Design a protein with these regions (language model features):
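NAD(P)H-binding glycine-rich loop region in Rossmannoid oxidoreductase-like domains
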Residues: 44-84
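NAD(P)-cofactor binding segment of oxidoreductase domains
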Residues: 76-104
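NAD(P)-dependent short-chain dehydrogenase/reductase
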Residues: 140-191, 197-198
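Amphipathic terminal alpha-helices
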Residues: 281-299
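Rossmann-fold cofactor-recognition segment
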Residues: 32-46
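Mid/C-terminal beta-alpha module of Rossmann-like enzyme folds, strongest
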Residues: 202-203, 209-256, 297-298
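N-terminal Rossmann NAD(P)H-binding glycine-rich loop of SDR-like oxidoreductase domains
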Residues: 3-23
């Protein structure tokens, strides 16, 4: 059984990777937040500790999953952000190359400036803020220096349910749970959702076929924050009882002050060309996510 070291796997993405790979691989999963029985402590920003822990496990693959993802935190704490999102990725490259094993790194649609209608795998990133720049610097270092790598760009993440999902869907679900009957939703942000379960499964397929390289990896379909909210209310049967108030991004400018691209829509061109696109339509994925993780949440 092949072995995988999963660094920074205590978050929503790590949950799905653990579930998808645990039956077929011997796993060591680490994080600074040890929030599950299958996790042990490791701070991947500490190169020597990270290196020693990985080498002791002697894996066949290194998955570097963790990052700061709050844009506001990143803007306010640039050094901590670059240490976590960029320098730690360089650490992962050094370790993977030393062991001559493939490295998986997770990038983001947020590295683009949003000026184009749709971004494929070969479009040139233009990051707008500290978070986006830190992630792009990590992506670029992997591509330029890792011996073998898989870099997968995610879109608007959803997954892992109310305990670990800190993103858009959970924020909406929390408002509904609190009894909100009117939701203020921006009408000027476009993107593509990414279900963490599908994402982990698609990574597994690429690794099995040794299709190394850089890939956009988002759910099918192009959408917006507004349409995602409308679909969520439809799934929950609340479209007639909860009102959507359309606002532009300036409405939330005090709370969400970090620069965000107006459009983060990705297309999985390389996955399609390699016949490796296993990402489902975002509406199908959203319906499954709500059914599997939020069955009794609003009761």
């Amino acid at each position: 059984m092949n072995k995988i070291y999963m660094a920074g796997s205590g978050g929503m993405l790590g949950d799905s990777f653990y579930d998808v790979f645990k039956g077929s691989h011997d796993l060591k999963c680490t994080d600074v937040d040890v929030n599950a029985a299958w996790l042990t402590y490791m701070d991947f920003r500490d190169l020597e500790s990270y290196r020693r822990d990985v080498i002791d496990f002697n894996p066949d693959y290194l998955f570097h999953l963790g990052a700061y993802t709050s844009l506001e935190y990143c803007e306010n704490h640039p050094d901590d952000t670059y240490m976590t999102n960029t320098i730690a990725v360089e650490n992962a490259v050094y370790i993977a190359n030393e062991l001559n094993i493939p490295l998986l790194y997770i990038s983001t649609a947020g590295i683009f400036d949003g000026e184009k209608e749709l971004y494929d795998d070969w479009d040139v990133p233009n990051p707008l803020g500290v978070y986006a720049r830190s992630k792009f610097m990590g992506e670029r270092f992997v591509i330029e220096n890792a011996n073998r790598y898989l870099v997968c760009r995610a879109g608007w993440m959803m997954g892992s349910g109310p305990n670990k999902d800190k993103k858009f869907i959970q924020k909406l679900m929390k408002q509904l749970k609190d009894g909100q009957t009117e939701l203020n939703i921006v009408n000027d942000k476009d993107g593509t959702p990414t279900y963490t379960v599908d994402f982990a499964r698609n990574c597994k397929a690429l690794i099995a076929d040794e299709c190394w390289g850089l890939y956009n990896m988002v759910c099918g379909g192009e959408t917006s924050r507004l349409e995602v909210t409308q679909e969520l209310l439809k799934i929950l049967g609340l479209e007639s009882s909860v009102k959507i108030a359309e606002v532009d991004s300036s409405y939330f400018s005090d709370e969400y002050f970090a620069a965000r691209p107006p459009n983060e829509r990705l297309v999985n061109r390389k996955l399609n060309l390699r016949h490796q696109n296993h990402m489902r339509d975002w509406k199908v994925a959203l319906n499954e996510y709500i059914t599997d993780y939020y069955q009794d949440y609003l009761k």
